[in-house]
């Protein structure tokens, strides 16, 4: 592993970027990070190369970016592939800010994304906030994706207080697994040891579901700030038998964790509905 530079001030947000053979897309991702209106120097960027197999192209791209921004960027290289869940866990261990965010290395974000998200957590003093995505297709077209539903309309207007109804609302609406659109309070993650499953796909679905159990308040911003690249060889598109098996294992792991936390029986109906969704 590799680390350079020390910030004189604690960053506002630590952003974790797992990378695997994405040298082709990293420049656009990095450029969008550099343009953040909240201030590049107010952010911490943790790039985790998950043992890429592209003759160091991805790693060299990350190291070059670290050399340009030694005080804001941390480059971490894994000798063994741990899949996105493992890479994200490593990234969290390096995070110094009060809030944590994630960006996929083949995506990019709007210049004001983190400014808008951070302004929300400051204004509403909430544990987490997220926004909406824009799906970008290879032919240049895009699709504006906005979360709908009564509970999200409510998020847009005010804070949802934590408690039993929060879990029921989560199960009813579903978070969608778009973890990359938000920022999350690090103390909640660390104090409750909320880790991503490793060597499994759909790790975001597990992590966001377990995180929701501990959130006292949450804000949803309807602004579309995250560009979600649609490419045929990405993790989401390569859905074969092993991917479906991973998805089933993730759902079983969620139920097991709910049982360990003592909430399964209380919300069994909602949890089973989510499992069958």
Question: Which residues does each predicted region cover?
Answer:
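A conserved hydrophobic helix/loop-capping motif in glycosyltransferases and polysaccharide synthases
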Residues: 13-25, 29, 36, 48
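Acidic donor-binding segment of Leloir-type glycosyltransferases
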Residues: 30-77
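Glycine-rich, basic loop-to-helix element that forms the pyrophosphate-binding segment
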Residues: 77-95
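Acidic metal-phosphate-binding loop of nucleotide-sugar-dependent transferases
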Residues: 82, 107-108
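Short aromatic/hydrophobic "clamp" motif used to bind/position activated sugar donors
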Residues: 100
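Donor-binding/catalytic cores of nucleotide-activated saccharide
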Residues: 108-219, 229-242
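C-terminal subregions of glycosyltransferases and related glycan-biosynthesis enzymes
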Residues: 229-277
């Amino acid at each position: 592993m590799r680390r350079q530079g020390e910030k004189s001030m604690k960053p506002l947000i630590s952003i974790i970027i797992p990378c695997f053979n994405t040298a082709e897309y990293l420049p656009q991702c990095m450029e969008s990070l550099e343009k953040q209106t909240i201030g590049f120097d107010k952010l911490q960027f943790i790039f985790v190369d998950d043992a890429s197999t592209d003759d160091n192209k991805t790693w060299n791209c990350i190291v070059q970016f670290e050399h340009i921004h030694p005080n804001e960027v941390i480059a971490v290289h894994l000798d063994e592939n741990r899949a996105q869940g493992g890479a994200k866990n490593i990234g969290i261990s390096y995070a110094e800010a009060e809030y944590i965010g994630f960006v996929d290395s083949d995506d990019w974000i709007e210049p004001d994304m983190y400014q808008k998200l951070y302004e929300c957590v400051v204004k509403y003093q909430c544990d987490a906030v997220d926004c909406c995505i824009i799906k970008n297709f290879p032919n240049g077209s895009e699709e504006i994706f906005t979360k709908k539903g009564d509970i999200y309309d409510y998020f847009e207007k005010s804070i949802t207080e934590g408690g039993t109804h929060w879990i029921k609302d989560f199960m009813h609406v579903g978070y969608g697994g778009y973890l990359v659109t938000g920022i999350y309070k690090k103390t909640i993650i660390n104090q409750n040891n909320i880790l991503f499953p490793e060597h499994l796909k759909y790790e975001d679905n597990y992590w966001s579901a377990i995180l929701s159990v501990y959130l006292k308040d949450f804000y949803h911003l309807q602004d579309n700030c995250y560009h979600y690249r649609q490419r045929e060889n990405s993790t989401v598109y390569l859905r074969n038998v092993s991917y479906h098996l991973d998805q089933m294992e993730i759902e079983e792991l969620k139920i097991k964790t709910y049982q360990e936390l003592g909430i399964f029986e209380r919300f069994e109906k909602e949890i089973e509905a989510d499992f069958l969704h």
